[in-house]
């Protein structure tokens, strides 16, 4: 059954079938041709896979990100980031990172962050003399903060599967996200200084004040979301609803940049993305069911434990596995398949689930940055028109190195659980 499922999945992907349908076809084929399980289990597993109130947060944050893009909120975020950062050497590239960090604090998606912020900043970076390869690498690296800085779609999936607090996971991603963002900014500064481009200029307080006044309502959006979650005012799902309502009010009544027709178009495009994401999660649960029927979970765990029983060693094994999977499959498809297998093993070893959740999110992001088919890498390459050889070897390896360093720090040091324990108290 496993062989039929995997072969069917590979064939579907080779023929260009969208990942959601590829997973659904492969899972259905595996059950039909390789088992005696009744076919209604396909529908049953699909709906059980998405039957969680917490999963409502995902389509809500997708809609919030779409509203931000169409309503002029993302543009104002970029303008504000530019006002406070563009005076630095390498300021245009640093602005890309800073704006991505702010946008990530609402969207929860790496792909949405790359598209929304990269679409604005990439032309400016190219005008300033940055190479297409460097521009693609920085856009991908900065956009990948979407699943790390709260709210994070990947962490919502982790929380739904494991039952761990999504709010704690969100807060646990703040420090790693800021470390990565600051590291990328330093790399931008070094690159610009070494190549003598993007000289920056004089810091102008009046420009910053004007940008701040114009973007204050946009900047309040991530503050309300993160502050509300950290303060216990609302759950992750409620935060998604607040983000949608707030973004809509600001876009329609404050900035007056969204008409009724625009809103309908936003709903239409966001609905397509919502449906695809939920289909990926639902069909992935069929894979988990097949793995359970075949006893693959225990076989994989036994194999890993035969290599090492050290939690640190197991972390690195899982990271390597997640990176390989992430090169070929979106994290939303990989997590529902892999987590039910891996999570009980780490829980039995007493590993902190805040640490495990953040490391999983970082690992899937790393897979999205890694060739041959990392989704973040290809999105940014499409935006810049760069080629693989110009992007990966000179620049993307440094971005990947930064991500790896932060993952190692999160494994060796209690970085992911420090802030959640400070805000919510130690997890029981």
Model-based region annotation:
Residues 1-428:
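Alpha-helical transmembrane segments of multi-pass membrane transport proteins
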């Amino acid at each position: 059954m496993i062989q039929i499922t995997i072969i069917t999945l590979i064939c579907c992907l080779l023929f260009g079938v969208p990942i959601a349908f590829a997973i659904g076809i492969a899972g259905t084929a595996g059950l039909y041709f390789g088992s005696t399980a009744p076919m209604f289990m396909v529908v049953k597993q699909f709906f059980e896979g998405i039957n969680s109130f917490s999963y409502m947060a995902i389509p809500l944050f997708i809609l919030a990100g779409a509203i931000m893009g169409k309503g002029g909120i993302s543009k104002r975020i970029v303008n504000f980031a530019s006002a406070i950062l563009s005076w630095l050497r390498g300021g245009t590239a640093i602005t890309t990172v800073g704006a991505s960090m702010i946008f990530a604090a609402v969207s929860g998606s790496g792909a949405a962050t790359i598209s929304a912020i990269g679409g604005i900043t990439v032309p400016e970076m190219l005008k300033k003399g940055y190479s297409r390869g460097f521009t693609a690498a920085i856009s991908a690296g900065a956009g990948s903060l979407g699943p790390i800085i709260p709210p994070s779609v990947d962490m919502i999936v982790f929380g739904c599967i494991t039952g761990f607090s999504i709010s704690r996971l969100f807060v646990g991603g703040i420090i790693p996200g800021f470390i990565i963002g600051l590291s990328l900014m330093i790399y931008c500064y070094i690159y610009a200084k070494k190549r003598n481009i993007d000289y920056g200029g004089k810091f102008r307080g009046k420009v910053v004040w004007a940008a701040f006044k114009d973007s204050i309502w946009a900047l309040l959006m991530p503050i309300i979301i993160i502050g509300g979650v950290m303060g216990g005012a609302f759950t992750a799902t409620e935060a998604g609803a607040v983000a949608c309502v707030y973004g809509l009010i600001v876009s329609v009544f404050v900035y007056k940049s969204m008409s009724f027709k625009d809103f309908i178009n936003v709903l239409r495009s966001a609905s397509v993305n919502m449906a695809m994401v939920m289909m990926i999660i639902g069909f992935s649960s069929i894979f988990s069911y097949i793995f359970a029927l075949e006893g693959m979970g225990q076989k994989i765990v036994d194999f890993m434990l035969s290599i090492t029983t050290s939690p640190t060693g197991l972390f690195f094994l899982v990271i390597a596995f997640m990176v390989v999977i992430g090169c070929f499959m979106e994290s939303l498809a990989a997590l529902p398949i892999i987590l039910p297998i891996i999570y009980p093993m780490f829980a039995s070893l007493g590993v902190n689930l805040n640490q495990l959740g953040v490391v999983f999110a970082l690992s899937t992001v790393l897979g999205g940055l890694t060739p041959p088919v990392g989704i973040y890498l290809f999105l940014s390459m499409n935006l810049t028109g760069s080629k693989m050889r110009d992007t990966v070897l000179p620049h993307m390896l440094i971005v990947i190195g930064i991500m790896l360093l932060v993952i190692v720090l999160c494994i060796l040091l209690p970085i992911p659980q420090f802030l959640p324990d400070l805000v919510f108290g130690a997890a029981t």
